[in-house]
Curated annotation (Swiss-Prot):
Binding site for Na(+): 75, 78
A single GO BP: cellular detoxification of fluoride
PANTHER family assigned to the protein according to its UniProt record, in alphabetical order: FLUORIDE EXPORT PROTEIN 1-RELATED (PTHR28259:SF1)
Gene: fluC
Catalyzed reactions: fluoride(in) = fluoride(out)
Location(s) in or outside the cell: Cell inner membrane
Species this protein is from: Nitrosomonas europaea (strain ATCC 19718 / CIP 103999 / KCTC 2705 / NBRC 14298)
Entry protein name: Fluoride-specific ion channel FluC
Length: 127
């Protein structure tokens, strides 16, 4: 029981630290729509796509690796709660176009990055 807990804890810690670092480095550049949250979500989308495709080709790999990367790292890196708070803040300030644009970029961008991650592994496997 300790292996899964440690895998998730390690992944979450690393993902959370990266998200925090991205926020520190990027959010001052454009505070109305903090880019750190967007970059964190896009990176997490790409990594989860790579992980899904990679783990599909590695069925004998210990399940703790999936927990570390997908549940832990990507879960700690991506941030729906911060995204939600930022969107609500934009709406409260009457910046409706910014809010709708941010929603579209976060959701579409994350989906595109997940597909790109899957495509990356598929491309490497076929090369």
């Amino acid at each position: 029981m300790w292996k899964p807990i440690l895998a998730i804890a390690l992944g979450s810690t690393l993902g959370g630290l990266l998200r925090w670092g991205l926020g520190l480095k990027l959010n001052n550049l454009f505070p109305d729509v903090p880019p750190g949250t967007l970059v964190a979500n896009l990176i997490a989308g790409y990594v989860v796509g790579v992980a899904i495709a990679f783990f599909a080709h590695m069925p004998n790999l210990s399940p703790e690796w999936r927990l570390l990367v997908i549940t832990g790292f990507c879960g700690g890196l991506s941030t729906f709660s911060t995204f939600s708070a930022e969107i609500v803040s934009l709406l409260q300030r009457g910046l409706y176009a910014w809010a709708m644009s941010a929603i579209a970029v976060h959701v579409a961008g994350s989906l595109i990055m997940t597909l790109a991650g899957i495509a990356t592994v598929t491309w490497f496997k076929s090369s």
